[in-house]
Structures are given as C-alpha cells and as structure tokens.
Amino acid sequence: MGAALALLGDLVATVSEAAAATGFSVAEIAAGEAAATIEVEIASLATVEGITSTSEAIAAIGLTPETYAVITGAPGAVAGFAALVQTVTGGSAIAQLGYRFFADWDHKVSTVGLFQQPAMALQLFNPEDYYDILFPGVNAFVNNIHYLDPRHWGPSLFSTISQAFWNLVRDDLPALTSQEIQRRTQKLFVESLARFLEETTWAIVNSPANLYNYISDYYSRLSPVRPSMVRQVAQREGTYISFGHSYTQSIDDADSIQEVTQRLDLKTPNVQSGEFIERSIAPGGANQRSAPQWMLPLLLGLYGTVTPALEAYEDGPNKKKRRKEGPRASSKTSYKRRSRSSRS
C-alpha cells in the first residue's frame, strides 16, 4: 500500500508540472482532454503546413517530448494506478473514487436522480412570492432599497431626493397651494362673520310684526260691499268711511303732517321697538368668547360643529308615528258551543 501511495504522489507531481508548463488543468490532463487537443493541433499543422514528423509538430507547438509523453500517458497511468490499487487492496470503490478524483476535478454531477425519480428537476422550484410568504414585506423592502445604490449611495440619495422634491414643486405644490388658499379663505370668512355676529350690537325690531298686524286689521275691517259702492253711499249720506282706520274728523282740510297724525286714530297701538340687547361678558376675566344662547346654533352652524343634542334642542325630538293597529283577528277557530235551550 505504501508503494501505491508513492506512485500516486509521483503521478500527481508529474501531472502538476505538465499542467503548469502547458496551461491545461489537472482535470483536463487526467481526463485525456489535453491529449485530444494536442492531437488536433498536430493534425492541423500536418494539413496546413505539411509537417509530417510528430517531433517537429511538438516543437512547433512549444512542447517538449517529456511533457507530451506525460500528457498522453496520464489517462493510462490513472487507469493503471486504479488497477494496481484494486489488485493490492481488493477495493474497487477506492479505484473508482481515484478515477473520479482526476476525471471530474471541475465538473460535479448531481446524484439526485440516483436515489429519487430519474426525471426529477435538478433545481427546486420556488414561486416569486415564496420569500414574501415566509417573511411578509421582504419583497417590498428589497424593491424599495434598490432605489439607493449601495455602491454610490451618496449621489443616488441626492438624485432621488432632488427628483422627488422637483416633482412635488412641479405637480403637487400648485394644487396644495390652491387648496390651502381656499381653505384659509373660507376659514377667515367664517371666523370674521362669527366675530362680527358676536361683537355687534343687536336690537329688537318689531316692524314686521306691526306691519303684519296692520294688514290683518285692514282686511278684517273690509266690508263685503265693493269699496266704490261704499264711497258712493258715504258721499250721499255725508259720512266718512275708512278702510282700516277710523277717523275722528276729516283729514282732507289738514294743513300739515302733524295735524294728519293727530286726527288719525289707530285702534291698535304700535309695539315699541329698538330695545338693545345687553351683551354679557364671560365671567372670570379671561376674556373668553361668549354668545347668547339664541345665537349659539348660528355660530356652531358656521363652524360646522352642530351636535345632535343641539339639533334635537332646535328642531325637537324626532317622534316616530306609531302605526295604528286595529284589533287582530284571531287565527284560532273558536270552538265554543252555543248555549242550547233546555226546551225541546
């Protein structure tokens, strides 16, 4: 076994020197790929340049006879070493492993199909949202972090922020400015109107009531006879008829408005108007805003903060009309028997 290991060491050293001299890898030399490549080059030289001697072709390629011998004899040496080891130890598995060590130096063969289904894929299939299912939100984080280049995060960050700021100034700022101006104008108008209503002086005016009373009294005194006929009768009898007022004397010969006012006698005196409402100040000296109770719904309506309790106070509770229910007809049949007379 020691001799086999010594031969293995010499073989590895020789193949390594040949690989360093030619540029081929150890795996290519052991597998025979390097020898096949050299044979193709020698054949091409013989075809193109007419070189028939192998030594001249090897010299033209730039190889020495020793190196050429090592490259062409390496696959056989590996096979012979495997046979020697198998003969000495009786372990064919070790020879197979040694052959694979040189033959498959850079190429790995998957053994999945040897133990599972032969037509199985060599790579597991994962859906696009596989990692997002395992870690929710990781895809969104990865997609967003690509906007900042880790290698040049400074210029990328500056470019991204400046572009976002420019988009805001160009697209969103005019709309936001107009909305803000509209909102502030509306708020200023409502605030000014509310302050005006709070600080102004209010007075009780009964002119509409006096006018309504005058019109009501006028129409209540009208005669069912047409006014033209009433005037004709009054002129014939020498009396004065007033539609809505009673005169103590004629006002046709009055000299001034004061005299007309003195002669005019109204049965329903006017209600005095012009009484000012005293404005109350908030107690405590904090100069808080205050308003009378009858003005509170108006102010709250301007600010848009009318509460349901205030609506119920102003409009009254919403009373639902109960449905009038008549006597329900009994679904059960009366099984009471009539009282029979004892007479036959």
From Swiss-Prot:
Residues 273-308 are annotated as: D1. GO terms for molecular function: channel activity; DNA binding; structural molecule activity. A motif (Nuclear localization signal) lies at residues 316-324. It holds the Pfam family Polyoma_coat2. Residues 313-344 are annotated as: DNA-binding. A lipid is attached at G2 (N-myristoyl glycine). Signal peptide: none annotated. Residues 312-344 are annotated as: Disordered. One of its GO terms (cellular component) is host cell. Keywords: Capsid protein, DNA-binding, Host endoplasmic reticulum, Host membrane, Host nucleus, Host-virus interaction, Ion channel, Ion transport, Late protein, Lipoprotein, Membrane, Myristate, Transmembrane, Transmembrane helix, Transport, Viral attachment to host cell, Viral ion channel, Viral penetration into host cytoplasm, Viral penetration into host nucleus, Viral penetration via permeabilization of host membrane, Viral release from host cell, Virion, Virus entry into host cell. Residues 334-344 have a biased composition (Basic residues). The keyword Iron-sulfur does not apply. GO terms for biological process: monoatomic ion transmembrane transport; symbiont entry into host cell via permeabilization of host membrane; viral penetration into host nucleus; virion attachment to host cell. InterPro entries: Polyoma_coat_VP2. The chain crosses the membrane at residues 290-310. Belongs to the polyomaviruses capsid protein VP2 family. This is Minor capsid protein VP2.
